[in-house]
């Protein structure tokens, strides 16, 4: 543990193995069977327990929890482990849990992965290299994720599923089956169903104007002609309706995204 930098408030159990130039920030708790390889950095308030190994140059941010027992009723304190490779970035509130007897006794993470805030990696998962997990992705147990996969925020993957190499899963997707390599998976996107009439009424908007604006957006999103022409026609037709004018102004602004699809 030569050249290691350990904050005075960190709790390092006897038996912990530290490589060179390891940095352990305030209030971290490290168990006795943990191995931290060279240049690992724990920012602060990181908890690492169990039989756990963290590869070199991995950086772990506050309130992450690594190597805790699996969340299964059958767990019987077996000596399972958590192995994390090199050059990983593990952001705030990430949880990576140890393996179990029913899954090879090991949860394994490869190299060069990015785990954004709140990601959960369940017991016995096998994660490849160069994978991106966006915020609050949740993997159940026994899941395999191939190299270079990208999983969008708030997506959840069912136990035993396989996520193929170079695949992409869109945000908010419930994944209950295998995803082929190079596959693109997405759940149904949010649609525009109308106007927030109840909220508008509560804020004092004129009811007649609100209902008229609802008719206007129906004409914009589902009328005849191209979209730009419909916007122009509606702007002329409802030029005395301040709500419609505000919507038209928004539609005419530059944007890098499309508008939510209208479904009445």
From Swiss-Prot:
Involved in the biosynthesis of lipid A, a phosphorylated glycolipid that anchors the lipopolysaccharide to the outer membrane of the cell. One of its GO terms (molecular function) is acyl-[acyl-carrier-protein]-UDP-N-acetylglucosamine O-acyltransferase activity. Pfam families: Acetyltransf_11, Hexapep. It is found in: Cytoplasm. It comes from the Bacteria. Its EC number is 2.3.1.129. This is Acyl-[acyl-carrier-protein]--UDP-N-acetylglucosamine O-acyltransferase. It comes from Rickettsia peacockii (strain Rustic). Pathway: Glycolipid biosynthesis; lipid IV(A) biosynthesis; lipid IV(A) from (3R)-3-hydroxytetradecanoyl-[acyl-carrier-protein] and UDP-N-acetyl-alpha-D-glucosamine: step 1/6. One of its GO terms (biological process) is lipid A biosynthetic process. The lineage of its organism: Bacteria, Pseudomonadati, Pseudomonadota, Alphaproteobacteria, Rickettsiales. Signal peptide: none annotated. Homotrimer.
